[in-house]
From Swiss-Prot:
It comes from Kosmotoga olearia (strain ATCC BAA-1733 / DSM 21960 / TBF 19.5.1). Its main location: cytoplasm. It is found in: Cytoplasm. Coiled coil: none annotated. It comes from the Bacteria. Specifically methylates the N4 position of cytidine in position 1402 (C1402) of 16S rRNA. This is Ribosomal RNA small subunit methyltransferase H.
């Protein structure tokens, strides 16, 4: 079932991705977060249709959109409804030992934020869900309504980087249970924060808590680390890893892994994260927090 959705997704940092991924004729690439297919399309076009992209996405609804968007490139793509964490199983099923590059564009897609019924957005009143895979067993409502207050506070503190108010937010959530919708959760967060704190923040006051719960529901940081550890084993010498992240926890995970492997299995190509141009941010405000890091197999 494809939900009501009227806004197209704009892939972030496409030119920077091509620069660091360096797609070549006859290359084989894994786009582990296919989304609506924008980066994959750019990779294929950069090689004049002379490469292959294995596209993965855990979200079956988004994958269906990508399949439509990439139908003119069906000879160049193979699409799979799996998490990028399991890319190795896909490669084995295709009898592919090594690839020329891995790309991850981590974060919530425009579709997930805007399509009705997904429960990712604090702007739309709908049931709390936040599962990137609809076959996932744990929803945001499960986390919000069943986790002990202390565990909720830890998640909001660590994953949401809500340093000062994590305990207050967790306490208010527990007081207001059951919380079944996104707006009910927003109201609990609002009640936990002093008015001056809400007005002081540049981003919506619910952003950090929503991020924390989404990361917990989908096991995002653990999955990222697991995939990173496997990537070098499936990269040809000179093959590249390009990761685009949207919050500091993801970026820190990538940075630390690259540093651990620098000179061992990888050579870091970006000593500092690459950020979007001023022009891109003005045209696509969602790009403002994106950071790109890249490394090459040695």
């Amino acid at each position: 079932m494809q939900r009501q959705y009227n806004e197209s997704h704009r892939s972030v940092m496409v030119q920077e991705t091509l620069h660091y991924l360096r797609p070549t004729y006859n290359g084989v690439y894994v786009d582990g977060t296919l989304g609506e297919g924008g980066h994959t399309k750019a990779i294929i076009e950069a090689t004049s249709g002379k490469c292959k992209v294995i596209g993965l996405d855990i979200d079956e609804e988004v994958l269906a959109i990508a399949e439509q968007n990439l139908k003119e490139f069906k000879e160049n793509v193979e699409l799979f409804n799996v998490s990028y964490v399991d890319f190795d199983l896909v490669l084995e099923s295709l009898a592919v030992d090594k690839v020329d590059g891995f790309l991850l564009d981590i974060g919530v897609s425009t579709y997930q934020l805007k399509a009705k019924g997904r429960g990712f957005s604090y702007e739309i009143d709908e049931p709390l869900d936040m599962r990137m895979s609809l076959s996932g067993s744990v929803t945001a409502a499960d986390v919000v309504n069943s986790y002990p207050e202390k565990e909720l506070a830890r998640i909001i503190f660590e994953y949401g980087e809500e340093k000062r108010y994590a305990r207050r937010i967790a306490r208010k959530i527990v007081e207001r249970r059951p919380i079944q919708t996104t707006i009910q959760l927003v109201e609990a967060i609002k009640a936990a924060l002093p008015p001056q704190e809400r007005f002081r923040r540049k981003r919506h006051y619910a952003t950090r808590t929503f991020q924390a719960i989404r990361i917990e529901v989908n096991g995002e940081l653990k999955g990222l680390r697991t995939a990173l550890e496997k990537f070098p084993n499936y990269l040809k010498p000179g093959g590249r890893i390009v990761i685009i992240s949207f919050h500091s926890l993801e970026d820190r995970t990538v940075k630390h892994f690259f540093r651990e492997q620098d000179g061992v299995t990888l050579k870091i190509l970006t000593r500092k994260p690459v950020v979007p141009s001023v022009e891109e941010v003005s045209e696509n405000p969602r790009a403002r927090s994106a950071k790109l890091r890249a490394a090459e197999r040695i």
